C-alpha cells in the first residue's frame, strides 16, 4: 500500500478518506474546508466555441456540474471504489437516471418483488404504460426464479441489497453471474448497506445507487442521490439523465452531504452494534407478533448475510409488529418517548414508521405476517441501546395496560 496522501484517495484507509475526501483548501481565502459555491454559472474561456456545452467534468453551468457536486462525486466514487459517480437531487432521481439512460421501448427488466415504493410504481405502472418497458417482479432470494425470468430482451436486473422493508437479503454474487450470462446490466440499491460495510462493485455489479439522504449524509437535513460505476456507464448517465433532464443536487445539499459523510464509519459502527442489541431484545419480547432482522439466526438469509457482509454486521434496519390490530400499532408508536415517528432512515436519531398490511405497492408479495399485522419499520440511530430498549418496553407496557 502506498504511503497515505490525502490528495491520493486510493492511498487512504476508509476512515481517513471519509475525513479528507471531497475537501480542498480554498485558494481564494485559504480556508481549510471546501466552501459552498452558490453559483449557477462559471467563467467561460476566451473562445467559448472550444467548449463542450454538455461537459460534466469542468464547472460551467451547475445543472451539468458545479464545484460542490464534483467534490462530492469524487469522494463517493472513492468510498465505493468505483471509477466515477453522478450525484442527483434525490435517491429517486438517481434511480430514474439509471432506468432512463439504459432502457428503451420494448426492453425487459427484472426487479425485486419487494422494493422501494417509487421503484415499484415506475416498473408496475409508469414505464410499462407510457414507454412499453416490461418488468418481471421476482423473489430476489430465489436464484432459480431470477434465472427463469430472463428473456432475450432483458436489459437490466435491479435489486436492493436488503429489501425495504422486509429485510430479505439478495445474493449479489449470484445475481452478478446471472446478469453476465444474460448480457444485462445489474444495478443495486445499496442504501441500507453503505461503504465500507459493503461494496457491491467489488463483486462485479455494474452500477451502485444510494439515497444520500439516508446513511451517507446521516443527519436528516439534506437530500441527494448517487449512481457509482465505471467511467463509461456513468458518462452516459451524466450526458443523458443529468445534463438533459436535470434532477441536479444543490450546492448546499452537496456540501452538507460531503460534511455528513465525514462521520459515516463511526456512525455505522454505533448503529450496527445498537441494532443487534435492540433486535435481540425484540426477539425475546412476547408481546410482538414478529421481528425480522438479518442478524437474527432465525432470519431466512442470516447465513447469506453473514457471508456476504463479511461479519461486519447486519445493518441497522429491522421490521416488527406488535401483537394486535392497526390501532394497537398506532397506540404503541404514540407511547414512544425517545424514538421518533417519521419516514426516512439512516439518520442520527432512531425513526419508526407504521405501515399497514396493504399500505405499499406490491404488498401482496410481503410475508404473511406483514400482510396480517402491517409492520413497524425501525431505523436505529445513535442513541444508547439501553434507552431505546427502555423506550420500547415502556411503550409496550402502556399499550397493553
Swiss-Prot record:
Q: Which organism is it from?
A: Rhizobium leguminosarum bv. trifolii (strain WSM2304)
**What's the Enzyme Commission number for this chain?**
4.4.1.43
CDD domains xref list: CGS_like (cd00614)
Q: Provide any one GO MF term from the record.
A: pyridoxal phosphate binding
Q: Which InterPro entries match?
A: Cys/Met-Metab_PyrdxlP-dep_enz, Cys_met_metab_PP, PyrdxlP-dep_Trfase, PyrdxlP-dep_Trfase_major, PyrdxlP-dep_Trfase_small
Q: Per its database record, what is this protein's job? A: Lyase involved in the degradation of canavanine, the delta-oxa-analog of arginine, allowing growth on canavanine as sole nitrogen and carbon source. Catalyzes the elimination of hydroxyguanidine from canavanine with a subsequent water addition to yield homoserine.
Cofactors, names only: pyridoxal 5'-phosphate
Please identify the protein, giving its name as recorded. Canavanine gamma-lyase
Gene Ontology, cellular component aspect: cytoplasm
- Note the Gene3D superfamilies from the entry: Aspartate Aminotransferase, domain 1, Type I PLP-dependent aspartate aminotransferase-like (Major domain)
Q: Which family does it belong to?
A: Belongs to the trans-sulfuration enzymes family.
Q: Which biological process terms from the Gene Ontology are attached to this UniProt entry?
A: transsulfuration
Q: Give the enzyme class.
A: lyase
Pfam families referenced in this protein's UniProt entry, alphabetically: Cys_Met_Meta_PP (PF01053)
Q: Which UniProt keywords apply?
A: Lyase, Plasmid, Pyridoxal phosphate
Its UniProt entry gives the catalysed reaction(s) as:
L-canavanine + H2O = N-hydroxyguanidine + L-homoserine
Amino acid at each position: 500500500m502506498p504511503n497515505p496522501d490525502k490528495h491520493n484517495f486510493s492511498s487512504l484507509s476508509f476512515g481517513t478518506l471519509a475525513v479528507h475526501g471531497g475537501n480542498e483548501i480554498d485558494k481564494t481565502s485559504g480556508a481549510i474546508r471546501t466552501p459552498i459555491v452558490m453559483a449557477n454559472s462559471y467563467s467561460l474561456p476566451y473562445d467559448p466555441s472550444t467548449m463542450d456545452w454538455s461537459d460534466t467534468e469542468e464547472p460551467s453551468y451547475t445543472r451539468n456540474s458545479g464545484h460542490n457536486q464534483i467534490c462530492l462525486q469524487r469522494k463517493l466514487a472513492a468510498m465505493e471504489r468505483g471509477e466515477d459517480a453522478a450525484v442527483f437531487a434525490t435517491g429517486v432521481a438517481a434511480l430514474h437516471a439509471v432506468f432512463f439512460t439504459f432502457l428503451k421501448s420494448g426492453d425487459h427488466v427484472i426487479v425485486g418483488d419487494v422494493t422501494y415504493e417509487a421503484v415499484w410504481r415506475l416498473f408496475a405502472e409508469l414505464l410499462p404504460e407510457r414507454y412499453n418497458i416490461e418488468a418481471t417482479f421476482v423473489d430476489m432470494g430465489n436464484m432459480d426464479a431470477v434465472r427463469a425470468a430472463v428473456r432475450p430482451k432483458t436489459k437490466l436486473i435491479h435489486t436492493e441489497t436488503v429489501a425495504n422493508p422486509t429485510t430479505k437479503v439478495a445474493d449479489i454474487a449470484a445475481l452478478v453471474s446471472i446478469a453476465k450470462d444474460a448480457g444485462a446490466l445489474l444495478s443495486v440499491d445499496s442504501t441500507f448497506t453503505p461503504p465500507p460495510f459493503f461494496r457491491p462493485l467489488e463483486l462485479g455489479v455494474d452500477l451502485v445507487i444510494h439515497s444520500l439522504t439516508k446513511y451517507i449524509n446521516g443527519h436528516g437535513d439534506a437530500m441527494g442521490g448517487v449512481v457509482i460505476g465505471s467511467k463509461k456507464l456513468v458518462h452516459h448517465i451524466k450526458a443523458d439523465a443529468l445534463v438533459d433532464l436535470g434532477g441536479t443536487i444543490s450546492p448546499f445539499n452537496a456540501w452538507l452531504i460531503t460534511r455528513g459523510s465525514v462521520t459515516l464509519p463511526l456512525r455505522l459502527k454505533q448503529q450496527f452494534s445498537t441494532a443487534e442489541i435492540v433486535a435481540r431484545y425484540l426477539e425475546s419480547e412476547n408481546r410482538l407478533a414478529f421481528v425480522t432482522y438479518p442478524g437474527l439466526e432465525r432470519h431466512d438469509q442470516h447465513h447469506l448475510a453473514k457471508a456476504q457482509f463479511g461479519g461486519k454486521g447486519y445493518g441497522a434496519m429491522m421490521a416488527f409488529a406488535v401483537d394486535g390490530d392497526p390501532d394497537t400499532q398506532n397506540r404503541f408508536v404514540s407511547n414512544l418517548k425517545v424514538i421518533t415517528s417519521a419516514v426516512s432512515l439512516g439518520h442520527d436519531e432512531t425513526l419508526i414508521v407504521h405501515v399497514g398490511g396493504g399500505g405499499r405497492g406490491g404488498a401482496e408479495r410481503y410475508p404473511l405476517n406483514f400482510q396480517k399485522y402491517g409492520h413497524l419499520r425501525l431505523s436505529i440511530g445513535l442513541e444508547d441501546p439501553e434507552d431505546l430498549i427502555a423506550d420500547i418496553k415502556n411503550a409496550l407496557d402502556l399499550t397493553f395496560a
